[in-house]
Every structure is written in C-alpha cells, then in structure tokens.
C-alpha cells in the first residue's frame, strides 16, 4: 500500500480544483484499490480519501464522477466501510437529494450505494434518518419508484432493495402499512414486473418484512389491500385444476392460460413462500388462506419445483395449510414463547436441514451440468 508521503500526495490530487487529467489518474488509482478487500480495508483508515470521493461526485468531468461512484459502490459493498462512509463523510446529504433530479445520470449508482449501506440495521437507521431530514422521506421515495420513466437516464430498480432494507425498521413498516396512505397497494403490482429481477425481488422482500407485523394480517388479506393474488400469481403455473378448485381460488388465479409462467428466480420464489408462511402465523391468516383455496396452487408448485430450499419452504407452508389448528392459547404463533432448550434444538435441526439442502442443491446442479454419456454436446 501507499506510504504516508505517497498517500498525502495522492490526496492532494483529489480536489475539485485539480487539473482533470491529473485528477482522473488519481481517481482511477483509487478505483483500482477498491477492487479488492485489502484496498477497501486500507481506505477504511483513510477518511480523507472517502471524503474526497464523495466530494468529487460533483466534479464537472463525467469520467471522474463515474469512477468515484464506481469506487463508492465497491466500498459500500464492504460492511466494515459502512460506519466510516456514513459518519466520516457527507455521503448521505450529498447523494440522497440527487435522487429527486429526473435528469441526474448517476441515480442508479446512488440507489445501489444506499441499498448497500442500508443492509445492516445501524447504518439502515442512518439512511432512514437522513431521508427524513433531507425532506425526501419514504413517501417521496415510493412516489419516485412507482412513477415509470421518472428518470429517463436511470431505471431506479435498486430503489426496491433499498425499500426492502428500510422495512427491517419498525418505523418504515409503520409508514408502508399506514391504512390512510395507500402505499403498499402501489407496490403490489411489482411482484410480477418482468423487466427487472431486482425490482421484483426488492418489492417481495418489502412485503415479507411488512408481514412480520402480524396485527396487519387481516387488513393485508382484506379487499382493501388484497395481497394474496400478488403473492400467489408468481407461484402459479399453467396446470389445469378442477372446476371446484378453480372456483375456490381468488378470481385472478382462476383458469390460468396454458402459457402461464412461474417466477424464474428461486430466491424470489422462496421469499414469496416465506411471506405466505408469515401470513399463516395468525389464526385469521390461516383461515383466509385456507378459504381462498391456496393448497391446490402449492400442490402443483411442489410438483414443479426443483430447488431444495424452495421445496422445503413450500412443504412448511403446505403443512400449515393442511395441519390441525394449534391448541387454545397458541393461535398466534408469533406470540408463542418457546423454551430456550427447545429453541436451541430447533435451531440445531434447522442448521442440519440447511446443510442437507445445500448438498442436495449441489448434487442437482452437478447432475444438470453433466452430459449424458454417448451424446455429443
């Protein structure tokens, strides 16, 4: 790495006033450092370099700004850099307001940086607080996200994982679930947004987080929100169901066409199942999912699914749908207190199950990659 004198000289080149060619070489060197862990950890102890990168995101040179944003994306991907970036620089106050500029070229990079910084609770709170203080707020963020073509130069897909990360905070979920704001209803259609897996996954993650607030389950499943079809449709396929089974389903799930395709990403399929599973944690949720005939959709999905982790999530949901009701006093599974020894045993069993599923997944991938003997590729 650089000596102290070399670092001092390099830092002197990272100013708005420096000649563009010299500055470009300096930002290019810093970008190279951020391409590996050792370089990132070196910069972790150099807050002046971090400050300079943030400042240069306002440079007149597009090439220099691009390098700085690329470097900040790399740095923000390293959790150990989150606190230095948030506490030692003006990264939040400099970048967040630019999201509201429909002409800003680098908005997608800002979304990625904010998504990275909000992955863990401590800096997630910093991001949430900054949004409020800078008069952007979740309401404006959702409005920008839901306005197609808001920025002609950026897709803003990474606002979805940012929203998902923010909803790990109770106060963010409280906003999304505010019955007077009609926020969650605006997000629901994006569970089937074909143009971007990032947008779909982020929205499904947001819905899953919101379903941890079980007091809202009845409202979420009511006609006021009608969340169920938006969770089920990506899991439903073209299989023909009986007339009786179709009639029991929500209208949007009835008599699906022969070319109906399921969600292609296994991680999103798993999150959808986990969201449905959360809704079965309350008595009212279980009753509604059973009355809406969710089981046939899951039955056909289970036949189709190949990923071991997703299959396991599906089987747990099916068990909740067809199993007996919990005994009196245990109707709300999120309020049940589990003895510590039982909890530890369950965690141990879950770890073993995860390990076995990972082995199964590796075996499946291996078998899919091997060519049948005697056949030309």
Curated annotation (Swiss-Prot):
InterPro entries recorded: ARM-like (IPR011989), ARM-type_fold (IPR016024), Hgh1 (IPR039717), Protein_HGH1_C (IPR007206), Protein_HGH1_N (IPR007205)
Coiled coil: 340-373
Span list, region Disordered: 339-377
Keyword Cell inner membrane assigned: no
Positions of disulphide bridges: none
Pfam families: DUF383, DUF384
Highest taxon of the lineage: Eukaryota
Keywords: Coiled coil
Family, per entry: Belongs to the HGH1 family.
The name this protein goes by in its record: Protein HGH1 homolog
Organism this protein belongs to: Danio rerio (Zebrafish)
Lineage: Eukaryota, Metazoa, Chordata, Craniata, Vertebrata
């Amino acid at each position: 790495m650089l000596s102290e004198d070399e670092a001092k000289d390099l830092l002197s080149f990272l100013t708005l006033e420096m000649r563009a060619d010299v500055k470009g070489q300096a930002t290019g060197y810093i970008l190279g450092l951020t391409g590996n862990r050792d370089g990132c950890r070196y910069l972790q102890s150099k807050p002046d370099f971090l400050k300079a990168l943030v400042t240069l995101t306002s440079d007149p040179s597009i090439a220099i700004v691009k390098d700085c944003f690329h470097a900040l994306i790399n740095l923000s991907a390293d959790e150990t850099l989150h606190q230095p970036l948030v506490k030692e620089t003006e990264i939040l106050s400099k970048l967040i307001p630019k999201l509201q500029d429909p002409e800003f070229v680098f908005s997608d990079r800002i979304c990625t940086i904010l998504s990275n910084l909000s992955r863990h609770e401590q800096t997630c709170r910093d991001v949430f607080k900054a949004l409020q203080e800078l008069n952007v707020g979740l309401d404006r963020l959702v409005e920008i996200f839901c306005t197609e073509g808001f920025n002609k130069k950026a897709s803003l897909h990474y606002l979805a994982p940012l929203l998902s990360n923010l909803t790990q905070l109770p106060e963010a979920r409280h906003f999304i679930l505010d019955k007077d704001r009609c926020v969650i209803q605006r997000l629901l259609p994006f569970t089937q947004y074909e143009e971007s897996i990032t947008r779909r996954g982020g929205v499904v993650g947001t819905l899953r987080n919101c379903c941890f607030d079980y007091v809202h389950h009845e409202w979420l499943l009511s006609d006021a929100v009608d969340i169920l079809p938006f969770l089920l449709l990506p899991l439903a396929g073209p299989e023909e169901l009986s007339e009786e089974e179709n009639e029991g389903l929500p209208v949007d799930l009835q008599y699906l066409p022969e070319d109906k395709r399921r969600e292609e990403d296994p991680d999103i399929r798993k999150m959808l199942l986990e969201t449905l599973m959360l809704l079965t944690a309350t008595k009212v949720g279980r009753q509604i999912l059973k009355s809406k005939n969710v089981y046939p959709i899951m039955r056909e999905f289970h036949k189709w699914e190949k990923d071991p982790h997703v299959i396991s999530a599906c089987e747990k949901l099916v068990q909740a749908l067809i199993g007996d009701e919990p005994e009196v006093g245990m109707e709300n599974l999120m309020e049940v207190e589990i003895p510590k020894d039982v909890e530890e045993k369950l965690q141990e069993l879950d770890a073993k199950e995860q390990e076995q599923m990972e082995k199964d997944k590796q075996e499946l991938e291996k078998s899919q990659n091997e060519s049948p003997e005697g056949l030309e590729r």
